[in-house]
Amino acid sequence: MVKSVGNLADFEAELKAAGEKLVVVDFSATWCGPCKMIKPFFHSLCDKFGDVVFIEIDVDDAQDVATHCDVKCMPTFQFYKNGKKVQEFSGANKEKLEETIKSLV
């Protein structure tokens, strides 16, 4: 299941709750074409990687999180372990998204 996070406090709580698990964060917007294109694939990865926490953040609804995480374009994927960012990339690249997850779990 992909969790939607709407503010910075919830985002930080999710990172803390995940502990040592990998957290994959999708920063997107409803008006972003590439974001819409990759969203079903992002959701499908939940089934493939059961021990990974998946979070989606709408940058328009959660501007505080986008600013805190220094998101400049959409979609941006950030990867966290133990509350710290370990990887990041921008763009709707399905192969890169899956390969990055595989390399970090």
UniProtKB/Swiss-Prot annotation:
Main localization of the protein described in the UniProt heading = nucleus
Residues modified to S-nitrosocysteine: C69, C73
The entry's localization annotation reads: Nucleus; Cytoplasm; Secreted
Lipoprotein found in the keyword field: no
Record flagged with keyword Cytoplasm = yes
Pfam families membership: Thioredoxin (PF00085)
User: Could you cite one Gene Ontology molecular function of this protein?
Assistant: protein-disulfide reductase activity
Residue ranges occupied by any Thioredoxin domain in the UniProt entry: 2-105
CDD domains the record matches: TRX_family
List, from the UniProt record, the residues annotated as the active site of this protein. C32 (nucleophile), C35 (nucleophile)
Q: Which GO terms describe its cellular component?
A: cytoplasm; extracellular region; nucleus
Post-translational modification as stated in the protein's UniProt record? May be nitrosylated on several cysteine residues, depending on the oxidation state. Nitrosylated Cys-73 may serve as donor for nitrosylation of target proteins.
Q: Where is this site: Deprotonates C-terminal active site Cys?
A: D26
UniProt keyword annotations, A-Z: Activator, Cytoplasm, Disulfide bond, Electron transport, Nucleus, Redox-active center, S-nitrosylation, Secreted, Transcription, Transcription regulation, Transport
* GO biological process, alphabetically ordered: positive regulation of DNA binding; response to radiation
Q: Where is this site: Contributes to redox potential value?
A: G33, P34
Q: List the disulfide bonds.
A: C32-C35
Question: What family is this?
Answer: Belongs to the thioredoxin family.
Q: What does this protein do?
A: Participates in various redox reactions through the reversible oxidation of its active center dithiol to a disulfide and catalyzes dithiol-disulfide exchange reactions. Plays a role in the reversible S-nitrosylation of cysteine residues in target proteins, and thereby contributes to the response to intracellular nitric oxide. Nitrosylates the active site Cys of CASP3 in response to nitric oxide (NO), and thereby inhibits caspase-3 activity.
Protein name (record) = Thioredoxin
Per the UniProt record, the source organism is Gallus gallus (Chicken)
Question: What gene, per UniProt, encodes this protein?
Answer: TXN
